[in-house]
Amino acid sequence: MIAAPLDAVADSKGKKPFYSHLYVQVLAAIAAGILLGHFYPELGTQLKPLGDAFIKLVKMVIAPVIFLTVATGIAGMSDLKKVGRVAGKAMLYFLTFSTLALVIGMIVANVVQPGAGMNIDPASLDPKAVATFADKAHEQSIVGFLTNIIPTTIVGAFADGDILQVLFFSVLFGIALAMVGEKGEQVVTFLNALTAPIFKLVGILMKAAPIGAFGAMAFTIGKYGIGSIANLAMLIGTFYITSLLFVLVVLGAVARYNGFSILALLRYIKEELLLVLGTSSSEAALPGLMNKMEKAGCKRSVVGLVIPTGYSFNLDGTNIYMTLAALFIAQATGIQLSWGDQILLLLVAMLSSKGAAGITGAGFITLAATLSVVPSVPVAGMALILGIDRFMSECRALTNLVGNAVATIVVARWENELDTGQLARALGGESEDTSTAGLQPAE
């Protein structure tokens, strides 16, 4: 676990000064990056390596964090049937809310119509601008995605940092440890001991988060400019507001039903949220999120299964974006889609969002995969939103992160693997929801 604050930085009341909190430092770094990128764009674009280097540092520890969390969690299970049960419940949750996110994006696009009146001639669009994404989309398939989960070698899975491959091996290894009983106890003891320095390393790496966030934000604003947002402000605003309402209303209702406050959860994971905002990478927050969910009372076995799987299958923000962006392109190019066309779009999106999971730029690639199958909407229309996709990706990643945090608590509660008292303490008990209603045990 990450070490407690040092006495040297504590004030007379035993609290850390506000500027020593990671979320304050990241927030300040984001603001500084925006200012530098806006006023000195050339310098801002040159700072891209800072963000890239930080993300690589975090990716370096993702595989061992997943392996240790999953393997030790499953090895400690007395009933191995729980592994299948947890995975099944998690997939049911993912399917339900991923589909709901797709439907919400479609409904909002029909009601708000952010692309109406643009009157873009599809023939004037440059298909070369999105050719790379379209090619990657054609390379993806459900069968290929599923077979790729199985690593060619154990070392290869860890070397490549493929989350699902590492998860696949970790689950099998954890089951094997549990099955050998006493013979595997020394291995479990070693892995448990190894967990402490690995999470300590995560804590050390997180100290560089402000530098990474500063460089990534300076690059984004320097390269694309704040002005690029204004050109498609309607789409960006619609997407951000829809995602915010999805988190507060839909996930908020799920949270309330399961005995905790979504606002309290957002406060609890604020450092991870700001990290995602600064780097536009949800992977950067994966180790910290897993650590915090375990500290919040979710059993390690549940955390280890739900969060890494959710990073590929529970992409609420990406799903809202897919249907909203697809209908925006249709509206902007003056293409009228029937309800039959939209239902086809929805069904294809449900499949393509899984087939391209875990790829860099997954949101844009899954959109290309969807449009390439639905003939009514031109794939070249993606050129309209290519310039603002970086700004959209931050909202996608933030929504995905919150969705996976909620999913972890819910699945843990369903499995009676949630310490509700510890959850209440972790979330702070500051919101009225948690202080008055309390946390009820799973039924």
Swiss-Prot record:
Keywords (A to Z) from UniProt: Cell inner membrane, Cell membrane, Membrane, Symport, Transmembrane, Transmembrane helix, Transport
Protein's cellular compartments: Cell inner membrane
Physiological role: Responsible for the transport of dicarboxylates such as succinate, fumarate, and malate from the periplasm across the membrane.
A Pfam short name: SDF
GO MF annotations in UniProt: fumarate transmembrane transporter activity; malate:proton symporter activity; succinate transmembrane transporter activity
Protein name: C4-dicarboxylate transport protein
InterPro entries the UniProt entry points to: C4_dicarb_transport, Na-dicarboxylate_symporter, Na-dicarboxylate_symporter_CS, Na:dicarbo_symporter_sf
HAMAP family given in the database record: C4_dicarb_transport (MF_01300)
Entry GO terms, CC: plasma membrane
Family assignment from sequence similarity: Belongs to the dicarboxylate/amino acid:cation symporter (DAACS) (TC 2.A.23) family.
Membrane topology qualifier: Multi-pass membrane protein
Bilayer-spanning residue ranges: 17-37, 57-77, 92-112, 139-159, 161-181, 201-221, 234-254, 320-340, 368-388
Gene Ontology terms describing biological process: L-aspartate transmembrane transport
